[in-house]
Amino acid sequence: MEIKYTGMELKLHRHGIRTALASVFGAMLIATPFVGDSALANGIVTGKVFWFHLSMALMAIGTVVTAWPGGRKSIPFALPDGLLLLFAGITLATYDWQLDPEPEKLLFGGQLVVLWFLLRYFLTEAPCLKFFFLFVLMLTGLVEAVWGMQQLHGYAYSNHSLFRLTGSFFNPGPYCGYLAVVLPVCLWTALRFQKGMHYFGWVCAGAILIVLPAGMSRSAWMAAVVACGWVYWTERIGWEKTKAVCRRYKNATIPFIAIVAILVGCT
């Protein structure tokens, strides 16, 4: 039986395929921290690296296949795009090509640049994916936090003989760093949205806050405090309220800024 599509139906069909592929490949990328392969040398690390390469390749192929036919929305060039390209250009210009000390990191950085523009394309074509990616990212943070709690209480094994808390990573450093990255996202979601995403954001943030201090990573603590402070300032305070407070307490503003700068420098 032959199935015929009208122009609008064909367009919706292609849009659905594009959205489904973006959802699958995006979820694969976000789930990279959970990947490990015991058949590889240092499989906890190399497994994640190979999985990221595979996910990026599939995402790029899926983008080419779905973007080739039909019309597409125009993606405006924004300031972050220019800053990212400028940073990539400076990195390439200052890299020691003769010595070539970090080819793997150079490849990884190039893939991140490509990933940025792939996400720009997919989120422009299907804005609903923003909520899906947010949910999956926060879910990974919640799973990592629960995983860490199980390791602390002896219900799960750690991946390092010297550390009790590693999550799905090899040591506490990247584990705490990942939690510090996901935490401000959870806080932003809890402050920005209502109902389901609001409560889920607070649950994820609370779970991360419980386990993050046990990682004993001061850099992760500082990153989490600064990022969460910035998120709260943008969502609840803003520049206008800040200027009003500075004008009201102008005699104490400069000493306060100086003390904060000294404390940050000492740490």
Label for each model-derived stretch:
Residues 13, 17-35, 53-65, 85-96, ...:
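Alpha-helical transmembrane segments of multi-pass inner-membrane proteins
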Residues 35-49, 68-73:
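Short, hydrophobic transmembrane alpha-helix segments
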Residues 1-15:
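Short, Lys/Arg-rich, polar N-terminal cytosolic tail immediately upstream
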Residues 74-83:
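Interfacial transmembrane-helix boundary/kink motif in multi-pass membrane proteins
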Residues 36, 45, 77-78, 194-196:
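Alpha-helix initiation/capping motif
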